[in-house]
A protein has these predicted regions:
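N-terminal secretory signal peptides that target proteins for export/translocation
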Residues: 1-8
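Short hydrophobic alpha-helices and adjacent helix-cap/hinge residues
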Residues: 27-329
Length: 329
């Protein structure tokens, strides 16, 4: 079984060569063919974990090729559309038996406009919060949606912070963060507390906003991906100087900048998608496979930021929470 990867970031010449069929001689033909289309890029922790789950579960069942849309870094709408067209060209030329996708942009720019209710089977994963906005499921598409433990996390924050009334949400200027923010706004309204927010485009803006957010009871840390000038060490250096309030996140890769995390397990998405693809390869009808939400989650603690913040966490959380180690990407 072969594994190959092409990224939009390497230029579309590489894609055209792939479509033309000029593949390395080491790749062996397989009875079944799987294409994995990631919305993002290698090195983005969430995407890497989904990929790992996919690769582990389809291994031995099909020849796997991968295309990375790179839409976090190449995030102009026209660039994303070009990436989607490049993925489409691979599908039309190589004719995979099943296509697995990760995250929203692969659905929005590839599946919905070109393959809705067509013949090619698609298994999506990492789709934020709901599939309804894309009219899913289709006759040829099913998958797993990604639901963050928002309510559980906010309830936990309320149990830690006395007289919790005001929170601040800080994230990046991206489509996925707009969707995440809306979920927190709904949850905040349901629980009767004020939620202010900022979606920013630079690390300086992020740090300035974070410092100002210390006037709130709780700071909710959204995704930083989409902020191109992010410098991990600089951000951490500033955070340890300014943090005075509890910060929470549902993104594992944001734990180097956050006190407490209740996070999704990205690998779960890839494992489910890979296993589902294998079922389809074995003849199971995709129309009988329902769209499902993720179920797994982890609790994380950043002891370094906790120690300088003055925040006290309950002993139960301190015992059960995993301590971060090299999660920043």
């Amino acid at each position: 079984m072969g594994f190959q990867r092409v990224s939009a970031h390497t230029g579309f010449l590489a894609v055209s060569l792939l479509v033309a069929g000029t593949m390395p001689a080491t790749v062996q033909a397989a009875d079944k063919k799987c294409l994995f289309v990631s919305s993002y890029h290698k090195g983005y922790a969430h995407a890497d974990q989904i990929e790992a789950g996919v690769r582990e579960t389809v291994k031995g069942h099909c020849e796997l090729r991968q295309f990375d849309m790179d839409s976090k870094r190449r995030n102009a709408k026209e660039d994303i559309k070009k990436s989607a067209l490049a993925a489409k060209a691979i599908i039309e030329s190589w004719k995979p038996d099943v296509v697995i996708t990760a995250d929203d942009n692969a659905v929005k720019y590839l599946i919905e406009p070109f393959y809705r209710n067509k013949n090619t089977p698609f298994v999506f994963s990492g789709l934020n919060w709901t599939a309804a906005e894309y009219g899913l499921p289709y006759s040829n598409a099913t998958g797993m949606i990604e639901v963050g433990p928002v309510g559980v996390m906010l309830d936990r924050a309320a149990s830690i912070v006395p007289r919790f009334r005001r929170a601040f949400y800080l994230g990046s200027k991206t489509l996925s963060e707009e969707k995440n923010l809306k979920r927190f706004q709904v949850a905040a309204a349901k629980r009767g507390f004020v939620l202010d927010h900022a979606l920013v485009g630079s690390s300086n803006e992020w740090l300035k906003t974070y410092a100002g957010a210390q006037e709130y009871d709780v700071v909710i840390i959204g995704n930083r991906h989409g902020i191109e000038d992010w410098n991990e060490q600089n951000v951490i250096g500033e955070i340890v100087k300014t943090t005075r309030k509890l910060s929470v996140t549902n993104h594992g890769w944001m734990m180097p900048y956050t006190i407490l995390g209740m996070t999704k397990v990205s690998r779960e998405q890839g494992e489910w998608a890979g296993k589902t693809a294998v079922r389809i390869l074995n003849g199971y009808k995709i129309s009988k496979i329902p769209v499902v939400p993720n179920r797994q989650r982890d609790v994380w603690i950043n002891s370094k930021i906790l120690a300088v913040s003055g925040v006290k966490l309950p002993q139960g959380i301190m015992r059960k929470g995993k301590k971060i180690a090299g999660l920043a990407r």
